[in-house]
Amino acid sequence: MQLKRVAEAKLPTPWGDFLMVGFEEIATGHDHLALVYGDISGSVPVLARVHSECLTGDALFSLRCDCGFQLEAALGHIAEEGRGVLLYHRQEGRNIGLLNKIRAYALQDLGADTVEANHQLGFAADERDFTLCADMFKLLDVDEVRLLTNNPQKVKILNEAGINIVERVPLIVGRNPKNEHYLATKAAKMGHILDMK
């Protein structure tokens, strides 16, 4: 187990009241959180989203990506379901950090795609560690999930880490002229399942 559960509090949102649960990485002290809606106990698979931190999309309303749109849609789907979990995975910029993400954006402004920009900065296309998310699910006593994602790699890694992903639920929202190239690159180079028609 790479994490410990350290704090929780109620979080009222436009979609309803969630329980915010804070986790801390034992080795580094880095923090992550889960938003839990309703009663997630029992044997029925839980609707869930693993949402990686994106300050620009989630808080600054960037149109360069689909992250903020996905965050809002996921919270709405979970509330409609009546129960579910959103894991907020604090690995900004596919885990290259905010400042490197800004540098990657500058390279994209010069014509690189999102994968090429990461490579030019010396990073892999995706540096995230989703095994941390498997630990969060385990600490919430969730072992069967209907995962809101377009990323089959997330499904594979979570399954390998002991979380049974019984269904991949598509979450295709937020397409706009500013992020068409970004989404096309995620589909072509990172294997994301997106209807690009």
Curated annotation (Swiss-Prot):
Gene Ontology biological-process entries: riboflavin biosynthetic process
Record note on cofactor: Binds 1 zinc ion per subunit.
SUPFAM superfamilies: RibA-like (SSF142695)
Binding partners and assembly: Homodimer.
Family matches, as NCBIfam families: PRK00393.1, ribA
PANTHER family per UniProt: 3,4-DIHYDROXY-2-BUTANONE 4-PHOSPHATE SYNTHASE, GTP CYCLOHYDROLASE II-RELATED
Protein name: GTP cyclohydrolase-2
Species of the source: Pectobacterium atrosepticum (strain SCRI 1043 / ATCC BAA-672) (Erwinia carotovora subsp. atroseptica)
Record gene name: ribA
